[in-house]
Amino acid sequence: MRELTVQTDCGLIKGMEENGALAWKGIPYAQPPVRFSAPQPVEKWSGVRDGTRFGPSCPQENEKRAPMAEDCLYLNIWSPDTEGARPVMFFIHGGSFAGGSASEPAYNGANLAQKEDVVVVTVNYRVGILGFLDFSFLDEAFRPNCGLLDILEALRW
């Protein structure tokens, strides 16, 4: 398996070859989230980040999606193993905003990237009460729909 290191605006990420595509997993797109607050842009890192494993799923009732952690704002990228610009498919997992994870096997983008010649991006975002509970009536510092704000931050990354 060939390992690949790429330079991003935030730092170096080591990826790998997977089923004929290039893959970088577990890339942070925001700072570890503060409960019920909008995500903050990720800071630059030094050294090389390991992009060969998925980041944790966001906390939810479905225990089958372990490991889970509140520090869950990570995305995954699969690209064809060819030069040149490609269209990007940004995939937001389902789950009625209550559950789901970008690391589910059904959302592995390697085959789609290789066969359809697109770059595939999957993203974790806060779900359930951590992503969509509205406390703004108590304090304006709380933001409703943090999960949607997470998705917007991933698109900005």
Task: Enumerate the language-model features and the residues they cover.
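Short, well-ordered amphipathic alpha-helical segments that serve as non-catalytic structural scaffolds
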Residues: 151-157
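Non-catalytic accessory segments of hydrolases
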Residues: 1-148
